Amino acid sequence: MGTITVTGQAESGYQPLRASPAMRTDAPLLDIPQAVNVVTETVIRDQAARSLDDVLGNISGITQTNTLGGTQDAFIRRGFGQNRDNAILTNGMKTVLPRSFNATTQRVEVMKGPASTLFGIQDPGGAINVVTKRPERVFSGEASAGASSFGGGNGMVDVTGPIAGTSLAYRLIGSHNNTEYWRNFGRNKEWLFSPSLSWFGERTVVTASYMRQGYSIPFDRGTIWDIDAGGPIPLDRRIRLDEPFNVTDGHSALTTLNVSHELSPDWRVTFDYSYSTDDYTDNQARVMAYNAATGAVTRRVDATRGSSMIGHAARLDLTGTARLGGMKHDLLMGAEYDYHRTLRSDMIRCPQAVSFNINRPAYGSVQTCNRVVATDSDQYERLRSPSVYFQDAIHLNDQWIVVAGARYQQYKQISGRGRPFVLNTDTSGSKFVPRVGAVYKATPSTSFYANVAKSFRPQSSFSSYMGNLPPEEGLTYEVGAKWEMARGLTANLAVYTADKENVTYFENVNGVIETRAAGKVRSRGVEMDVSGRLTDQWSVIASYAFTDAVVKEDPDYTGKQLANVARHTASLFAMYDFGVLDNGNGFKLGAGVRGVSKRPGINDNSYFLPGYGVVDAMAAYTFNTRNPVTVQLNLRNLFDRTYFSSSLGSSRYGNAYGEPFNATLSASVRF
């Protein structure tokens, strides 16, 4: 019987050594001519991360952008990004999941810079890959429960192991969360169920998984910025400006299939397929105007009913190693097909009313309604995108590696809205997307690299008054260095410049968010990331980034900074592990700080969200029983700093507060 080799992430505590999706081969990070950062499972566990926001606070150059009232993942990478921009992958595949981090998550990888050659339609800022847990052939399990200082708590069960007498292994993960929202009303309710099954053959491994998640979460756009006063309106941060019916209710699902077959010791063929859905309904009392003299707030009740998104992604890869011309070649070739469909059925817009006053907050003066706006309903978009690609990593000698690759991408896009339906986009095209990079390994633990790559992304346009929008196109140059230091510490330094043309942004036109396109924007920056072990007791993950993202060509915004892009971001989290104590138990302490400088709150730069620094801390005690039990306390925003995590970018009426001080206490048992 042959030996099955399952490639993947090797890590030691906080130190990542490999990130196979970044090259779609099992390449060491030192051999990749691109900045790749990994937040390991150990970091996620120590920080008790609850979302991608928590995880990505450890990575340089990433800030939050418009999250649609806290209902979507939305991140800026190297100056570029928005919600629903296809940048967040699950196991290297595109999905339509609104929030990709959950109980199935094992680690998170960030591939900086253009990823279009390997992952298709992408921004030049990079891609975020959530890697999920898989069935294992050795039995293990974990059960945990936690409580929040906000009120309420959560629970999780994760069990995996072999099925006796077969070549099968299973994994079953379930979780439930029901916690109070930190502002004056609202609850976060979520549940998840995820079974998976793997079959291990002589040369083949097949894994199928299913995840279904239900959610009912606050739709909270934050507060108003008073530009004349130079700050937020004078209202306690816990007081909301909307109504208790501001809720998004929905469910999402993800079905995946992975087949990996070893053709020979050097060659492997892999097939991946994912099918994802997200269906939701939301209601909101949207702020439309504010009178600073009287404190009166004009609101409009809006709703989306019958919103549905579907995504299919299929990929076939052939990877292998060959010797040609006396040199080693790590080869990748493949084909991919992506399908994405969005339908928002009933768009409800009620009459505006002066229905709130910040001097006398009261709720209930407005109710939901059923006033469907025919011209804005049935928003529909469909994107089909087949492609083929090739990559060759050529090892010229023991020190030099040259990586060259290209993708030929086709696309067909239609979109429109209204009853009767008005088609405003019907476009198709193709694009050749290349990238070239080189690595110089000065020593076995030090490498220097350079790369140049293009990116390409057709634009979502059912909310555009312009009709067909030209695809966004980007070009990035990057140089950098990587180190693997003694005791298990990894570091990387990157310097880059990226130009993007035909960039979309959003404007509030009489209460309707319209999509528009700028001419050209440019982002330049420096990034530094460090993670791993300093000593046998100390582990650390740290980052710093300088990002200068400005509009270079546009009728209105030339010279303006891009909204929500901070020039400086920094983070540090350090953990001290006391090891095994005299009584046989374990104990560790950790603390860290996350800092973000001021950044524009709106496209015209008429106001800036202030910078902030937030301190976190944790302690964990493990009882060395037959089934180890760990009790963990995590403190976030230890000094209760008031800060803003992001803004709408299109108006001053949506500025999201960051969470105040909160504590979570959890207990987990492993078996």
Feature-to-residue mapping (PLM):
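Acidic/polar loop-and-plug regions of large Gram-negative outer-membrane beta-barrel proteins
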Residues: 177-181, 194-262, 275-309, 352-381, ...
